[in-house]
């Protein structure tokens, strides 16, 4: 295959190496193993991880550029470098250490140009990812290098999603913009007249509102009322088009999903406008699963992303529980202890955790099994 000759696995390269001196590649290998990147590569059991996730070579069709182990290595490399998909491919083409990290050798005359391959690999791994089974593989591999296996440290944190800070006005405007665009598209496809509404007037008012440095609460409330009413009207107009011409239109699954999210946004915004509290508040149209996580920090009172309850074993963190909805980590200390004992096969004798974990149930549990804790004693000292 002509295309596959552009990228080769390193194991296949010895007889046909494109260097004038064979010693050069050996020097590159030696420098790679001595580098920080090489040391990082040596601590991951990539083959076992690929097998656990069910990744395998395709027997039919074109051979993949990246082997199953190399796909996981590429994701580790992306997390390590912090590059975007495009930047990662550009550096992979020109950095031989990055290529060795992924067990490939790229012909300089035929570099990888499709940067979307990184996204495709990420989606494939995400569809097969089972955090618990993968952590068991990593724990068994790292156990010989860890000390203090009897000490369990627990804490909760938030893995923030990269998104702009959400506000009611931004959320309403995104909903209006998307819905109006599709109403116009439906009218063009059907050859019918576009229904009348106040979209352009609201768009001008919103633009003027965004340009102001200081926004009065009365002006914000007035514009929010107009946007809620317009969104309600656009949904009615869209439903009327669907009722009359629904058989002539084709809706994708993403379209239906986005529409249902916008309906929920309208319901929530109407309730908040009259002063009611809303549960499971949507903060992003694209990432409808993200919820506000109240952290109570001085710099950030609210964060947006997945809340995670972690255990730390000799500096290595493992995920005990992950959820995009807020939860009370204080009731999960027993699960943390059981998880560490399962991963390390060593009885936990010491626990260090925040005061939120120091409830009566956890204190009784630790006392019953002889586990010493970092909790402050209850009551007044004698």
Predicted features by range, described:
Residues 105-287:
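Active-site- or DNA-interface-adjacent structural scaffold in DNA-acting proteins
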Residues 34-73, 80:
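Basic, short loop/linker segments at the boundary and entry of helix-turn-helix/winged-helix-like folds
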Residues 74, 88, 155, 310, ...:
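Mobile genetic element proteins and their domesticated derivatives, centered on retroelements
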Residues 297-343:
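Electropositive, glycine- and tryptophan-enriched low-complexity nucleic-acid-binding patches
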Residues 1-47:
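Charged, often Cys/His-bearing segments associated with DNA-binding zinc-finger transcription factors
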């Amino acid at each position: 295959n002509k295309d596959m000759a552009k990228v080769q696995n390193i194991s296949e390269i010895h007889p046909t190496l494109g260097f004038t001196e064979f010693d050069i590649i050996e020097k590159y290998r030696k420098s790679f193993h001595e580098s920080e990147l090489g040391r990082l590569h040596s601590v991951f059991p990539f083959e076992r991880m690929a097998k656990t996730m069910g990744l395998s070579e395709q027997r039919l069709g074109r051979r993949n550029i990246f082997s199953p182990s190399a796909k996981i290595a590429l994701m580790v490399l992306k997390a390590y470098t912090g590059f975007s998909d495009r930047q990662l491919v550009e550096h992979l083409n020109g950095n031989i250490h990055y290529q060795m990290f992924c067990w490939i050798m790229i012909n300089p005359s035929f570099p990888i140009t499709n940067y979307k391959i990184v996204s495709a690999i990420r989606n494939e791994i995400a569809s097969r990812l089972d955090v618990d089974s993968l952590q068991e593989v990593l724990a068994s591999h790292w156990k010989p290098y860890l000390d203090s296996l009897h000490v369990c440290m627990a804490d909760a944190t938030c893995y923030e999603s990269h998104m702009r800070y959400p506000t009611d006005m931004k959320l309403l405007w995104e909903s209006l913009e998307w819905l109006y665009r599709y109403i116009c598209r439906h009218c063009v496809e059907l050859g019918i007249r576009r229904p009348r509404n106040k979209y352009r007037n609201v768009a001008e008012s919103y633009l003027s509102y965004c340009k102001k440095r200081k926004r009065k609460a009365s002006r914000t409330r007035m514009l929010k009322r107009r946007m809620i009413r317009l969104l309600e009207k656009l949904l009615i107009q869209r439903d009327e088009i669907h009722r009359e011409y629904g058989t002539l239109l084709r809706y994708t699954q993403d379209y239906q999903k986005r529409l249902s999210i916008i309906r929920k946004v309208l319901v929530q915004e109407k309730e908040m406008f009259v002063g009611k509290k809303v549960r499971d508040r949507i903060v992003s149209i694209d990432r409808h699963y993200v919820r506000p996580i109240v952290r109570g920090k001085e710099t950030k009172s609210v964060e947006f992303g997945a809340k995670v309850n972690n255990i730390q074993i000799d500096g290595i963190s493992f995920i005990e529980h992950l959820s995009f909805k807020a939860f009370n980590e204080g009731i999960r200390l027993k699960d943390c202890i059981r998880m560490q004992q399962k991963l390390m096969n060593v009885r936990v004798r010491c626990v260090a955790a925040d005061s939120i974990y120091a409830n009566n149930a956890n204190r009784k549990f630790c006392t019953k099994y002889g586990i010493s804790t970092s909790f402050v004693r209850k009551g007044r000292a004698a």
